[in-house]
Amino acid sequence: MAAAAEVSLLQECGCKGIRTCLICERQRHRDPPWQICLQKKCCFLYCPDTGWAAGAEGSDLEGWAFPFPGVTLIQDFVTPEEEAEMVRLMDCDPWKLSQSGRKKQDYGPKVNFRKQKLKMAGFQGLPGFSQKVVQRMGLYPGLEDFQPVEQCNLDYSPERGSAIDPHLDDAWLWGERLVSLNLLSATVVSMSPEAPGSLLLCSAPSVRPDAFEDSLVAPSRSVPCQEVEVAITVPRRSLLVLTGAARHQWTHAIHRRHIKARRVCATFRELSSEFLPGGKQQELGQELLQAALSFQGRPV
């Protein structure tokens, strides 16, 4: 029965507008995204040990780097047993078709971001299986006071050509930290700067943190921002946190070529200051928090 349901889903897609997946490209003879958009020319790899983005090996930018703040990567955040149980419980509920070959499950209020309006609309909280995960987040520096009010589960599949286009998450409702738990397979999150202009690079003779600090003295090369892409390798069962510049000044995306096997991602979002104590919608924010942290929710 499950296999038949999957075959049925493979014949459908949720793409709208310019978005495409393998299914609609084959059925409607649409061009895949890489025939429309050129790949970035200046590729960097994020190094979690230094917090810098370094030019890809073998490229013209090898040996050059720049600081890339606002990224925290926590490996082995859940155990293999916890991962299997979380995905099993997710699969007990229906997945809805979404854009670009993804499927999704939403636990959160119904939001109209364009009109900046929201309503509870049946939102009863985050799922029970996330309670221990959220509690564990509070044990890590920078997440001690993290209180998510929304969880979005996304299912990526190479058979559907799943991907997600470069985008910035909303900042009217959602707060400073975006927290994503990566399950079932590793992937790459691709970051691109929003601002025009040039990006200054420093010589990066080695991957030692002290060498990176020394290289701050003399930026000696620049590259156009519109050609820059930073690849963050996200291992299976790891937690990725984006804050600051990485949250607000760099778009994030996942390219189709980086989905090698089924990948499930649970992204947790907190409230912005407008919905926190002292904000003009603090009462609504308190209602959302109370519902979310009851951990009694089903997908809405």
From Swiss-Prot:
Occurrences of domain Fe2OG dioxygenase (ranges): 148-272
Top-level taxon in the UniProt lineage: Eukaryota
Secretion signal span: none
Cofactor: Fe(2+)
Consequence of gene disruption: Embryonic lethality. Conditional deletion in developing juvenile mice leads to spermatogenic defects.
Cofactor comment: Binds 1 Fe(2+) ion per subunit.
Entry keyword Metal-binding: yes
Reactions that this protein is recorded to catalyse: an N(6)-methyl-2'-deoxyadenosine in DNA + 2-oxoglutarate + O2 = a 2'-deoxyadenosine in DNA + formaldehyde + succinate + CO2; N(6)-methyl-L-lysyl-[protein] + 2-oxoglutarate + O2 = L-lysyl-[protein] + formaldehyde + succinate + CO2
UniProt modified residues of type N-acetylalanine: A2
GO cellular component: contractile ring; cytoplasm; midbody; nucleolus
GO biological process, one term: actomyosin structure organization
Sequence positions that bind 2-oxoglutarate: R263
InterPro entries: AlkB-like_sf (IPR037151), ALKBH4 (IPR032857)
Record localization: Cytoplasm; Nucleus; Nucleus, Nucleolus; Midbody
Keyword Oxidoreductase: yes
Enzyme Commission number(s): 1.14.11.51, 1.14.11.-
A GO term, aspect molecular function: actin binding
Main location: cytoplasm
Function, as annotated: Dioxygenase that mediates demethylation of actin monomethylated at 'Lys-84' (K84me1), thereby acting as a regulator of actomyosin-processes. Demethylation of actin K84me1 is required for maintaining actomyosin dynamics supporting normal cleavage furrow ingression during cytokinesis and cell migration. In addition to proteins, also demethylates DNA: specifically demethylates DNA methylated on the 6th position of adenine (N(6)-methyladenosine) DNA, thereby regulating Polycomb silencing.
Family of this protein: Belongs to the alkB family.
UniProt subunit comment: Interacts with ZFHX3, MLLT3, MLLT1, HSF4, EP300, TES, EIF3C, MTMR6 and PSMA6.
Protein name: Alpha-ketoglutarate-dependent dioxygenase alkB homolog 4
Name of the gene: Alkbh4
